[in-house]
């Protein structure tokens, strides 16, 4: 089973892999890092005008890192009713990157709401988002060593308390 979007992407020669559907019927697609920027532009033009959320996680110790995007297609002035309520079209995109070369194109210039979310993913997991205008730590001090949410992260035994002036 494929969603309308997945069929449309295949029809237009856009390589992706379906990872299935969640409990709400939202399809998850895997996109290669080198294809992500062009696919993101296509999705925006297709009508996915709202980045609901972006997050990242460490798949396994020593394994891949994943950047996850939840996109919504909101059509203003158009009402699609399912089960008595408006149902916008949604898709989940997963972009996997290797731990040694964890670079993924930023979608900041497509969806401005990716700004802080991509920065948090960088800060916690070390995923570098190419062409992000302000890619720097957002939660941890700039002097922090390592990426705290990686499964192979070794927590330091001592934390220096810094004065907030």
From Swiss-Prot:
Pfam families per the UniProt record, alphabetical: Complex1_30kDa (PF00329)
Record InterPro entries: NADH_DH_suC, NADH_quin_OxRdtase_su_C/D-like, NADH_UbQ_OxRdtase_30kDa_su, NADH_UbQ_OxRdtase_CS
Annotated compartments: Plastid, Chloroplast thylakoid membrane
PROSITE patterns: COMPLEX1_30K
Leading EC class: translocase
A cellular-component GO term for this protein: chloroplast thylakoid membrane
Keyword Translocase: yes
Keywords: Chloroplast, Membrane, NAD, NADP, Plastid, Plastoquinone, Quinone, Thylakoid, Translocase, Transport
GO biological process, one term: photosynthesis, light reaction
SUPFAM superfamilies: Nqo5-like
Function: NDH shuttles electrons from NAD(P)H:plastoquinone, via FMN and iron-sulfur (Fe-S) centers, to quinones in the photosynthetic chain and possibly in a chloroplast respiratory chain. The immediate electron acceptor for the enzyme in this species is believed to be plastoquinone. Couples the redox reaction to proton translocation, and thus conserves the redox energy in a proton gradient.
Family statement: Belongs to the complex I 30 kDa subunit family.
Protein name, per record: NAD(P)H-quinone oxidoreductase subunit J, chloroplastic
Organism of this sequence: Ipomoea purpurea
């Amino acid at each position: 089973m494929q969603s309308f979007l997945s069929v449309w992407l295949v029809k237009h020669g856009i390589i992706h892999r379906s990872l299935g559907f969640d409990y709400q019927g939202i399809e998850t697609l895997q996109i290669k890092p080198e294809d992500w920027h062009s696919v993101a532009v296509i999705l925006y033009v297709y009508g996915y005008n709202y980045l609901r959320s972006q997050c990242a996680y460490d798949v396994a110790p020593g394994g891949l890192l994943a950047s996850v995007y939840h996109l919504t297609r909101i059509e203003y002035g158009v009402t699609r009713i399912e089960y008595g309520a408006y149902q916008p079209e949604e898709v989940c995109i997963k972009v996997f990157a290797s731990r040694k070369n964890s670079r993924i194109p930023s979608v900041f210039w497509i969806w401005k709401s990716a700004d802080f979310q991509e920065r948090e993913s960088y800060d916690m997991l070390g995923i570098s988002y190419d062409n992000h205008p302000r890619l720097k730590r957002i939660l941890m001090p700039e002097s922090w060593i390592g990426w705290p949410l990686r499964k192979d992260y070794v927590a330091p035994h001592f934390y220096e308390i810094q004065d907030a002036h």
